[in-house]
Amino acid sequence: VIHPSAQIHPSARLGNAVVVGPLAIIEANVSIGNQCEISAHAIIKKGSVLGDKVKVDHFAVIGGDPQDIHFNPSTSSNVSIGDSTVIREHVTIHRATSEGGTTIIGKNNFIMAGAHVAHDCNTGNHVILANGCMLGGHVNVGDHAFVSGGVAVHQFCRMGKGSMTSGNAVITEDVPPQGLAHSRNKISGLNLVGMRRRGLSNEVIAEIKKAYHWVYAPAGNCIALAESALKSGEFTTPEALEFLDFFLGGKRGRFVQPE
């Protein structure tokens, strides 16, 4: 069902059973999958790609130009939204800065009202971005991560798989998988509730705890400590190894720290 007041460019491709509300705008070369809902006044900018069963609520803007003073508007880049993602009112998701680049939102994400996802970000699957949170450019968010309301994440930061960040936190350093981040670049432990809800066994959780204490209990360099843990042979579960590998994989080498 397409409302007669909606503006849809002739080159846009819409799947089956797509609903487009009043005064919505769908620009050139947009691709929208089956059973999507584009609400009144939503704007899908040129080249954006939406999977199946995506909901874009009122006044959201998908695929706008990056807020980068060096960006050339003639650059061909886009935004890709995974299946079954919900994008609520006034959300903004900007396209990538480089030629052929893509800002990627995974599947089954829930992006709440007023959240902002900047250029070149990449979110995994089952990510929740709560009201008013802000991801700077090139931020990477792992599967099942929860970014609470009002959180500001600095460009190029990594939010690890299953991590949770408390409301109004300021994050300018990487948050490890399953970590509980808060305040300004602080970590208070592990997201035990989230791990249990996702069905991780007690044995796996215990090994992640051991890895956490190996890296964070002593005062030292997180990267060197993670390397020593991996060399020790004491960690065997994929989840614990993923936690430790995280410290070796970043470009910035800076991580949230306990108080």
What is the predicted function of each stretch?
Residues 1-186:
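Structural signal for interior beta-strand "rungs" in well-ordered beta-sheet cores
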Residues 1-5, 10-11, 16-17, 53, ...:
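Terminal amphipathic alpha-helical/low-complexity segments used for targeting or macromolecular assembly
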